[in-house]
Regions:
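Cysteine-nucleophile protease catalytic domains, especially the papain-like/related folds used
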Residues: 2-82
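...with weaker cross-activation on analogous glycine-rich loops/strands in unrelated enzymes
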Residues: 63-125
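Short amphipathic alpha-helical segments with coiled-coil-like heptad repeat character
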Residues: 46-48, 124-125, 129
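Primarily a LysM-type cell-wall glycan-binding module
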Residues: 126-146
């Protein structure tokens, strides 16, 4: 499925600001993945990547995470008071923000293309630390602004 957005998704006003202070450091990047980031499940030490259903104790022996079957229910089970399903184009309830899940089915016969999942989190604003040598042009390029 290809999703083409012609206008920004509505904000609830509760979206967190994007910052690299915690999640963007070596410990944050090395021990957390997109799912942990999307639902705010930061850990300083994690032996394996966080997957939907893990916190709720749902066994994942038969799920490949390359299709959507049962994944929304697993996310809700992991985060019962924080998550509910909504349409991308509607504003979230107060104190909530959008998280979107995507899966890539991959090719089971190709070891390097077995598929995976990815989560995106909607932010209301971005905290950007200007670095020495930054120009208006490369900052605009970073934010994809013309």
């Amino acid at each position: 499925m290809i999703l083409v957005m012609s206008k920004p998704l509505p904000l609830s006003g509760s979206e967190p600001n994007y910052t690299q202070r915690l999640w963007g450091r070596t410990v944050g990047v090395g021990n957390n993945n997109c799912y942990a980031y999307a639902v705010g499940d930061y850990e300083k030490m994690r032996l394996q990547k966080s997957v939907p259903g893990e916190r709720a104790g749902i066994r994942n022996l038969s799920h490949t995470y390359t299709n959507c079957k049962g994944l929304p229910q697993r996310v809700i089970a992991d985060n019962p008071k924080k998550v509910y399903t909504a349409k991308a184009t509607e504003k979230c309830k107060p104190n909530h923000f959008k998280v979107m899940m995507f899966v890539a089915p991959g090719n089971q016969r190709n070891y390097f293309r077995q598929g995976d999942f990815h989560f995106y989190k909607q932010h209301g604003a971005v905290e950007y630390k200007v670095k020495k040598g930054n120009t208006y042009e490369n900052i605009a390029k970073f934010f994809k602004v013309r």
